[in-house]
């Protein structure tokens, strides 16, 4: 995939991800938290990852693994990528010039709740790793550990790890 197409794919995924109101600091968004974990699970599964949603540590933890079968004779490295899908509350009344849960571009920058912390980074990693898998250029095994409690102190993540 060429760079513009890859960037378009990243942008589309980030738009979908930002639209999910995964606010961990307010219990009324518990259903949105569940939907976000399921959305991540589905994206990872459709791209060849083994995925489990782990409960019992606060909000669900998405744990995904991709075992690279290419060049299986060589000893491969294993990379763990950590991130979080939960966000802080946001509203136009707090100074947002647009809907915080709708990704917008302004002056070459993306605006939207989570675009910087941490949904944007997760999508950069996911988009890149998925493309490397498709091109059969991924030379290592990859795991993603994506939690939904970072904005509330990551309680329980130490027990999970």
Q: How would you describe each model-predicted region?
A:
Residues 71, 150-151:
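Short strand->helix junction
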Residues 1-93:
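N-terminal helical capping/dimerization or prosegment-like subdomains
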Residues 76-146, 152:
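Active-site metal-coordination/substrate-binding segment of hydrolases
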Residues 156-161:
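Short, intrinsically disordered, charge-balanced linker/junction segments flanking boundaries
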Residues 5, 31, 35, 120, ...:
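Conserved active-site and cofactor/substrate-binding residues in soluble primary-metabolism enzymes
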């Amino acid at each position: 995939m060429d760079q513009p197409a890859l960037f378009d794919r990243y942008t589309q995924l980030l738009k979908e991800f930002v639209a999910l109101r995964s606010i961990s600091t307010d219990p009324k968004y518990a259903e949105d938290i569940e939907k976000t974990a399921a959305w991540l699970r589905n994206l990872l599964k459709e791209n060849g990852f083994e995925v489990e949603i782990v409960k019992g540590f606060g909000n669900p933890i998405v744990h995904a693994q991709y075992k690279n079968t290419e060049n299986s004779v060589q000893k491969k490295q294993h990379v763990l990528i950590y991130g979080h899908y939960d966000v802080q509350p946001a509203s136009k009344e707090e100074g947002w010039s647009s809907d915080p849960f709708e990704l917008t571009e302004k002056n070459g920058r993306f605006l939207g709740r989570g675009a910087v912390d941490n949904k944007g980074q997760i999508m950069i990693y996911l988009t890149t790793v998925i493309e490397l898998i498709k091109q059969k250029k991924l030379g290592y095994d990859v795991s993603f550990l994506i939690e939904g409690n970072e904005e509330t102190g990551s309680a329980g993540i130490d027990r999970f790890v």
